[in-house]
Amino acid sequence: MRYKKIESTYVIRLERSENVIEKLLEFCEKEKIKGGYFNGLGAVSEVEFRHFNLATKEYSSKKLAGQYEITSLHGNISEMSGKSYIHAHIVVGDSQFNSWSGHLGEATISATCEIFLFKLDGVINRKKDERTGLNLLDI
């Protein structure tokens, strides 16, 4: 991972074989980012989508492996139990122009991933909502 800071914005480039969520969490801990949002694009070789079922309060997942373009990656950064928390969604497309989308569980970079991350001043917290089973923003 390489990055550059311009005012309150970080321009991040993830490298081949790096995991998106893992690297973003490491980055936020290192830079002490407790609130923010990001968007990006690039290419992945593996991706795990997650979908939350409100009735069962459980996630199901779907994994893809191959060559996929990230056509949209966006999410936010908050803190839960004193640790960085990433909530991200992703859309990927294949060579036949099919696309898949959902909550991002994890993704492995195949070529590059270019992310613009905007740091907010202050802390945004999350807490578990017993009614839905989700970790919601505590605002």
Question: Which residues does each predicted region cover?
Answer:
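N-terminal intrinsically disordered, cationic/polar leader segments
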Residues: 1-87, 91-139
